[in-house]
Structures are given as structure tokens and as C-alpha cells.
């Protein structure tokens, strides 16, 4: 008994001695907030409570938060962010000198997710008065497709020139179209990676394979004219890839091997050391490909169209206090392609560097700055193939050097909780040329060098108002584009030049692109939207100064092209029912494009058939979009989308030796597109995803003489986690083995088809540290 009393007395004394020191002790509480993919979540609200003490901060651009002098050793933090389910976490100092917390916020209902592409600032999807599709990291992982452009094909209204894909098609066939605006090599939608342009500034096409899949946190697709914020190229919308930012040591790898001898490796790794963060991403791909000409038309010159590419991306960032970050990024990309015959090949080498700043000033202002530069070399060989396809002769060796510099700055100011003001500017200058060695019957006859420089400077502003059940966005942008130092110089080698050398005069033009968008919520589950806008696209240097040949068709450049001008409107309804388990959206859209740049047939009877890039007159695209998703439970999801587009030529001035195109359907635009997906995603049991895609009839040419028939394909992926960090899977694309037509081009005896791929299957594994939480 006496021993117990002694122990008790000593305990009271010890507590009495230490109490003053504990009461005066302060604790440092810090941490980071990220989503399940590992991407940091900026501007999340963090509220710390400990007894009567309370403090609040927002996470910085790097997802970090910090409380320096907390007068307690335990408490809670409440973390919330629009688009995510809130989290409360307990903390205790214990024996450490500070508290470090790692918080993961899981996305909330689909209507509460956040998009940045629609307004150049974060807006809840339920408050976005526009047609936006969000693909999460889970959506990308669940897609059986191997290449990122094939992932986007599940978005109704998204298409590439000539139904091509990046596995085997020439880079110049990778122009993006949204909402039936028609396709050429140049994109009519802007493609970004973390705010930096992915579109080739010289040609307008996209090198999709520059984006390692393992680095993706999400993908956003905004459909509808967006030149009001993004300028040229955003005629039909914006596609943006959002990559992961490191918060703690992490590593992700996906590797697979498939038929056609197709190995692939994609990985991302990142870490944070003090105020520094570092990430490295890379992807390597190769395929032996397939013969793109049908068996009935093949000759001895037809060989598999194949490709190989590699990309590496290194980013270093440094945190500036609690609310800022600077970074530098460097990337390198290389590819080689065989385009279906021994002579016809192309290869690309590209290096890019970028620096950026994200800085918050107080609670109401932020500044974003980006600058980048790119150097590219593109080689291409063209040939003339004999009618029996048993021989070919070299016709053209092209080399395209390209240099690009650009920058952008954006200021954002929050006027309380209900209004956001945005102002900014961006500048891009590209210098490029097409240096050609031309051949006739195997003889080198002349050299031709054509090219120039293009500079586009834009200023934009936006007022975003959210009041009660209304969201109103009023935005506008002025662009000034200039072409200068342009020329076409011919040097004879054998014989004479068919056209004289020309020094083109400098040209300039202005464009104003306004947009008014309104959303009205009719209760918690229904909203209606409407938008009116204008947009534009300046012709690329490729369209102005570079010619190209495909099979028996020679398409000439046109140095006198005008900018495309679009006027559009849309109206839609959004429904969310069954406690957000069912989300539906329908949108009607209407667009008129004046002076669209199209490949117009000028002499169909010649050999090769002659086409030239022309300002067609006016085309009109109108239609409806439907998107829906059913969340049966946490593991099962069913989604579908449908797009109906009627795109026709409504005004046309017939040039000499050409035929009238008035009333024709716009080339490369299918009238009907339907996609669907059913997914069961439970890593502890099975990962199963089935997708289907129907593409309707379309035409390959402006005269509507060469149709491309409808087709339906299905893809499948099945997998399972065999440990917390390791997943094995098998995937197959085109499991119905539908050999659909990709191209239909005229020949002297009829037409030549190119066909899509056969069944493509692969097996692989995904390795993630820490483990992914879907």
C-alpha cells in the first residue's frame, strides 16, 4: 500500500513539473492533400481544431498546408474541396517534434467534380455552362486502348483526320475535330498538357505519344468554341491532359506485350524533398504493325505500316512559401514510322523546355505564368506507286525544321464567393519551312524551299458570376496574327522550275472572340445551359506553304488562305437523379464557319489527282449530344454517349476547273456516333471493362464520291490485383475483328482503300507504390 502511495505522489509531482512546459509548447502541423491518383489538390480548405483553438488555411498550388504555432499537442483537421468528399482526420504530437499528415480526398458525385479547361480557372462541373467530359485516372486505366488518342475516341464528337490512330498513321493525319467541324491535317480543337500546347505549331497535328499514360491524373474535353480564352486552334473546343504532381515518394509503371510484336512501357515516378519536388515520366512503344491495303488490292510494294517512339519528361519544382511554386520542365520525343511501302517513311525528333510560376497573393489573387520553347525536325518521303502496286518511285524528300517560342500570363481575382475576374495574355511565334527534293521518274529535278514565320498575340478577359442558382460567364479575347518572312524558292537541278520563286508580302489580321454562357439551376437535380460565341483559327504554315501527297492525290498549299471564323450557339439540360447515381446531359449545338480551310479537288481527271487547300466558303454543323452515366454501386458503372451531326456546305464559290460542292456533306464527319462502356472495378476481386463504339457513314473527299462505311467495334479489358501494389491484366481492341475503311482515295482505275487494324490484344502488369485506391 505504501509503495502505491509513493508511486502516486511521484506521478503527481512529475505531472506538476511538466505541466507548465506542455502548456507553453507549440506544435507544427503540416501535410499535403491529393486525390487517389496521387495528383495534388490545390486551394483545398483546411480547418484545424484543438479545444478552443481554431485556424484555417488553403492548400497551395502544390497541395501543401502548414500551421506553424499550434498551442496544443492534439486535435483534428477538416479538409474540404469542391468536387471531393470532405475528410476529418485526428492528429497527435506523440513523441515527435511536429505532425505530418497525408490526406487523400476522393471525388464526390460526378456533378461535383471540378474542371479547369472551361473557364481557365477551377469551376465545379455542376456550375459549368458548357459541354465538358472529365476522364479520371481510373477512367484511363479502365480503357482497353493502348494509346491516349484511342482513349479519347469514347468521347462522342471526338475524331481524328481519316479515322486514323497514332499506332500506325502518319503524324500529319492526327488533326483533331470536335462536333463535326471537319478534319484536315490541322486541328480544329486545342490540345494542352498542363496548360502548355501539344498541337504542332507548324502543321496543326498532334503528337499524342508525347504524353506518357502513367503520368496522367485526368483528361478534360470541353466541346464548343473556346477562342474567347484560348485563341486560335480552339475553334471546336479544348482537350487538356492534367499530369500528376508528386507529394511523397511514388512510382507507377505499366508494361505490356501484344500481337504484331508490340511491346510498351510507361512509367512515372516522383518525390518531394523539403521545398523541392521532382518527377520523371517516360514511355517507349514499338509495333510491327499491319498492311493497311486490303488483300484484294495489295501488290509487292505493300508492307506493314509500323511505328516506334520514345518520350521522356523531367520536371523540377520548388515551393515558394505556403502559396507559390516555380517549376522547370524538359522533354524529348522521337518517333519513326513506315507508312505502308518501303519508300514512304517519316521520322520526328523534338525537344521542348518550359518554365512556370503559380503564386497566390493573400486569399483573393493569384498569378500564373508559363514560357516554353521547342525545336523540331520532321522528315518525310513520298512515292508514286504503280497501278498494279508492284513498284514505286521516289517523288519527294521533305525536311521540315521548326522552332517555336511562346508564353502566357494570367491573373485571377476573387471578388468574394460569387464573382471571379480573369485577365491575361499569351504569345506564340513559330518559324518553319518545307525543304523539298523533287523527283520525276527517279530523276532529281529540282529543290524547293518554302516557309515563313507566324506570330499570334492575344489578350483575354473573363467575368465569372455565381449567384444563387445562376452561373454567368462573359469572356472575350482579341488576337493579332501576323505572317512574315515568307517565300518559296525553287532551284533547278535537272531541267527548269515549273513555278517561279516568290517572296510573299507580310500579312496580318485581327480577330475578336466573345462568349456568353449561362447556367440556371432548377433545384438540386436539374439545370439548363445556354451559350453564344465566336471563334477563329488562323491557317498554319503547313497549309500556307507545304504540299503533300497521299497515294494518287497531290494536295497543294495555298499562301493566300484567310482565317476561319466560327459563329456558334448551344443549349442543354443536365439531370442528376437517384442521389447522383444517374447523371444525364443533352446539348443542342449549331455552328457556322466562314472560310473553312478544306482540301478542294481542282482537277479530278489528272494523274495524280490535284487538290488544293482553299477557303471553301461556308459550312454549317448542327446536331445534338447525349451523355449519361449510371453508378449502380461503388464497383459497377455503365455509361453511354451519342452524337448526331449534320455538317454541310451552305455557301461555295466554284473555282476554275472545279465542281460545285454546295449542299455536300463535309468530308471526314460521320453523321452518327454512339459509344458505351460497362465496368466492374473491384481490385480485390476483378477489374472488368467492356466498351463499344459505332461510327456512321462519312465521306473521304470534298465531292462526296469516295464514301467510308459505318462500322462497330468492341474492346475488352480484364485484370486483378495479385498484391496490394501489383495488378495483372489482359486487353483486346476490336474483338469483333471489324476491318473498317480508314481512307478511300482515287486512283487511275477506281479507288484505293486503307483499312483499320485487326484484333489487337496484349497482356501486361501495373505496379504502383503506394497502391492505387480507385
Label for each model-derived stretch:
Residues 290, 536, 592-594, 599, ...:
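C-terminal beta-signal and adjacent terminal beta-strands/loops
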Residues 227-228, 240, 248-256, 268-349:
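Periplasmic-side early beta-strands and strand-to-turn transitions of outer-membrane beta-barrels
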Residues 319-333, 349-496, 503-504, 519-521, ...:
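Face-selective signature of the C-terminal outer-membrane beta-barrel domain
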Residues 34-37, 45, 49, 80-84, ...:
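Short, acidic, small-residue-rich periplasmic hinge/interaction motif at the N-terminus
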Residues 466-472, 480, 581-585, 589-593, ...:
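Gram-negative outer-membrane beta-barrel transporters
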Amino acid at each position: 500500500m505504501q509503495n502505491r502511495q509513493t508511486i502516486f505522489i511521484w506521478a503527481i509531482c512529475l505531472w506538476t513539473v511538466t505541466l507548465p512546459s506542455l502548456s507553453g509548447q507549440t506544435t507544427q502541423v503540416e501535410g499535403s492533400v491529393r486525390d487517389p491518383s496521387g495528383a495534388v489538390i490545390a486551394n483545398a480548405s483546411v480547418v484545424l481544431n484543438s479545444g478552443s483553438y481554431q485556424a484555417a488555411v488553403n492548400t497551395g498550388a502544390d497541395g501543401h498546408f502548414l500551421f506553424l504555432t499550434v498551442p496544443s499537442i492534439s486535435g483534428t483537421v477538416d479538409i474540404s474541396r469542391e468536387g471531393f468528399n470532405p475528410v476529418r482526420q485526428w492528429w497527435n504530437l506523440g513523441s515527435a517534434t511536429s505532425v505530418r499528415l497525408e490526406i487523400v480526398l476522393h471525388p464526390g458525385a460526378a456533378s461535383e467534380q471540378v474542371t479547369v479547361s472551361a473557364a481557365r480557372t477551377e469551376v465545379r462541373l455542376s456550375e459549368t455552362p458548357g459541354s465538358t467530359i472529365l476522364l479520371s485516372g481510373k477512367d484511363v486505366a479502365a480503357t482497353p486502348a493502348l494509346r491516349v488518342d484511342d482513349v479519347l475516341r469514347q468521347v462522342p464528337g471526338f475524331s481524328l483526320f481519316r479515322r486514323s490512330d497514332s499506332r500506325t498513321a502518319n503524324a500529319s493525319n492526327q488533326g483533331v475535330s470536335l462536333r463535326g467541324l471537319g478534319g484536315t491535317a490541322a486541328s480544329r480543337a486545342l490540345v494542352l498538357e498542363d496548360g502548355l500546347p501539344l498541337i504542332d505549331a507548324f502543321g496543326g497535328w498532334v503528337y499524342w505519344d508525347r504524353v506518357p499514360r502513367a503520368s496522367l491524373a485526368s483528361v478534360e474535353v470541353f466541346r464548343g468554341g473556346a477562342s474567347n480564352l484560348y485563341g486560335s486552334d480552339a475553334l471546336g473546343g479544348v482537350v487538356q491532359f492534367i499530369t500528376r504532381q508528386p507529394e511523397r515518394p511514388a512510382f507507377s509503371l505499366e508494361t505490356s506485350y501484344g500481337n504484331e510484336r508490340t511491346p510498351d512501357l510507361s512509367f512515372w515516378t516522383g518525390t518531394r524533398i523539403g521545398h523541392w519536388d521532382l518527377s520523371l515520366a517516360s514511355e517507349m512503344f514499338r509495333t510491327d504493325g499491319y498492311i493497311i491495303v486490303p488483300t484484294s488490292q495489295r501488290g509487292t510494294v505493300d508492307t506493314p505500316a509500323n511505328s516506334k517512339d520514345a518520350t521522356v519528361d523531367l520536371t523540377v519544382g520548388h515551393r515558394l512559401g505556403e502559396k507559390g511554386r516555380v517549376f522547370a520542365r524538359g522533354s524529348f520525343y522521337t518517333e519513326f514510322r513506315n507508312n505502308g511501302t518501303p519508300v514512304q517513311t517519316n521520322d520526328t525528333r523534338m525537344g521542348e523546355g518550359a518554365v512556370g510560376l503559380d503564386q497566390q497573393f493573400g486569399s483573393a489573387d493569384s498569378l500564373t505564368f508559363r514560357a516554353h520553347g521547342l525545336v523540331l525536325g520532321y522528315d518525310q518521303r513520298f512515292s508514286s506507286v504503280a497501278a498494279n502496286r508492284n513498284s514505286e518511285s521516289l517523288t519527294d524528300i521533305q525536311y521540315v525544321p521548326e522552332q517555336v517560342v511562346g508564353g502566357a500570363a494570367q491573373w485571377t481575382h476573387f471578388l468574394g464567393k460569387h464573382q471571379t475576374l480573369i485577365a491575361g495574355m499569351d504569345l506564340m511565334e513559330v518559324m518553319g519551312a518545307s525543304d523539298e527534293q523533287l523527283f520525276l521518274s527517279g530523276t532529281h529535278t529540282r529543290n524547293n524551299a518554302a516557309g515563313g514565320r507566324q506570330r499570334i498575340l492575344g489578350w483575354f478577359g473573363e467575368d465569372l458570376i455565381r449567384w444563387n442558382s445562376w452561373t454567368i460567364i462573359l469572356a472575350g479575347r482579341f488576337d493579332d496574327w501576323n505572317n512574315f518572312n515568307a517565300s518559296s524558292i525553287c532551284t533547278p537541278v535537272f531541267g527548269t522550275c515549273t513555278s517561279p520563286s516568290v517572296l510573299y508580302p507580310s500579312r496580318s489580321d485581327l480577330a475578336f472572340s466573345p462568349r456568353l454562357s449561362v447556367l440556371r439551376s432548377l433545384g438540386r437535380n436539374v439545370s439548363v445551359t445556354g451559350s453564344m460565341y465566336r471563334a477563329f483559327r488562323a491557317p498554319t504554315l503547313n497549309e500556307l506553304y507545304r504540299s503533300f501527297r497521299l497515294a494518287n492525290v497531290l494536295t497543294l498549299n495555298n499562301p493566300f488562305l484567310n482565317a476561319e471564323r466560327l459563329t456558334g450557339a448551344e443549349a442543354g439540360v443536365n439531370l442528376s437523379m437517384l442521389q447522383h447515381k444517374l447523371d444525364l446531359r443533352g446539348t443542342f449545338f449549331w455552328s457556322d464557319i466562314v472560310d473553312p480551310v478544306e482540301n478542294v479537288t481542282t482537277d479530278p481527271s489528272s494523274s495524280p489527282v490535284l487538290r488544293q487547300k482553299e477557303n471553301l466558303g461556308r459550312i454549317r454543323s448542327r446536331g445534338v449530344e447525349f451523355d449519361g452515366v449510371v453508378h449502380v454501386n461503388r464497383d459497377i458503372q455503365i455509361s453511354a454517349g451519342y452524337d448526331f451531326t449534320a455538317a454541310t456546305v451552305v455557301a461555295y464559290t466554284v473555282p476554275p476547273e472545279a465542281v460545285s460542292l454546295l449542299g455536300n456533306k463535309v468530308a471526314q464527319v460521320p453523321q452518327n456516333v454512339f459509344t458505351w462502356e460497362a465496368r466492374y472495378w473491384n481490385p480485390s476481386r476483378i477489374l472488368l471493362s467492356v466498351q463499344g463504339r459505332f461510327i456512321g457513314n462519312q465521306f473521304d473527299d470534298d465531292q462526296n464520291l469516295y464514301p467510308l462505311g459505318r462500322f462497330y467495334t468492341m474492346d475488352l479489358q480484364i485484370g486483378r490485383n495479385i498484391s496490394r501494389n501489383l495488378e495483372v491484366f489482359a486487353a483486346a481492341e476490336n474483338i469483333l475483328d471489324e476491318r473498317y475503311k480508314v481512307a478511300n482515295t482515287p486512283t487511275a482505275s477506281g479507288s484505293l482503300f486503307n483499312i483499320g487494324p485487326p484484333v489487337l490484344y496484349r497482356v501486361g502488369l501495373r505496379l504502383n507504390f503506394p497502391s492505387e485506391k480507385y
